[in-house]
Amino acid sequence: MALSSGLLLLTACGGKSEDAGARGLLDGASQAFDAHDYTLATQLLDSLQKTFPAETAIQREALALRPKVIEQATLLKISTNDSLMALDQVTAEQTKKTLRWVKEPRMVEGFHISPAAYNPDFMNSTGIQARVSEIGEFYIVSSANPKLGHTSVALGAGTSEAATPAVPYDGESNYRVGSGEVITFSPQQSDTIGSFALQNRGKALTLTFRGKSRKAVKLTPAQVNGIADAYAYSSAITGARRLAAERRKLEAMLQVARNQMA
């Protein structure tokens, strides 16, 4: 009897038992990992770390599991990333064929444009050109001849409309050429126009010049498609570039996780 009492006393003094809640979170994280639910596994590990920091033995087990979760979650993200990047690359190749490359001697930089939209005398006319720069950025150039005092342009279809921000005359982005005026909108300022054209591909739209006076010009479905093609090409190029950068980040994360597992 005395021996049994002594064993009980030693067991009680040897350290407290683990918390059932902490063990439950770790078991849940392990089960989620086995089920390939890496988001849930991460959430449970985070909850365990925050709620039961004093459970050092269980935290050590969690520390061993976490890099495995990160590794598999990252591999899944890389696979998804690669699929999206391949899709963007195919889209870029296809839409590039619909565009023309223009680089004249007087130009500092060339651009891609729909062949139907290219007009060497563009700055002596009234309209817009959707262009894609050498690095894949979509931008709009508007020309009004004679002058309208315009500072922005809008595309409309019924009650739906998209417009650029106003770009006041500054002699640089908004400047004068002979009897006309030209505005080169930045990629950020042009995005709404490109997106609207892509959403309304195949439709006739109204182009409106806004400023001191207004002028509305009808765009044929072919003209709208030219804007949409340029925007789609730019979106694919910039999307693939962004995904390539994201892949490099994911590869670095994967290496860190594997180093922790080694």
What are these regions (language model features)?
Residues 65-96, 105-108:
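Alpha-helical linker/edge segments of TPR/alpha-solenoid repeat scaffolds
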Residues 14-20:
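Bacterial lipoprotein signal-peptidase II cleavage site
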Residues 177-191, 202-262:
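Internal interaction segment
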Residues 49-61:
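Short solvent-exposed coil/turn linkers within tandem alpha-helical repeat scaffolds
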Residues 9-12:
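C-terminal motif of bacterial Sec signal peptides marking the signal peptidase cleavage site
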Residues 38-39:
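TPR-repeat structural position
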Residues 26, 32-34:
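Hydrophobic/aromatic side-chain positions at a characteristic register within alpha-helices
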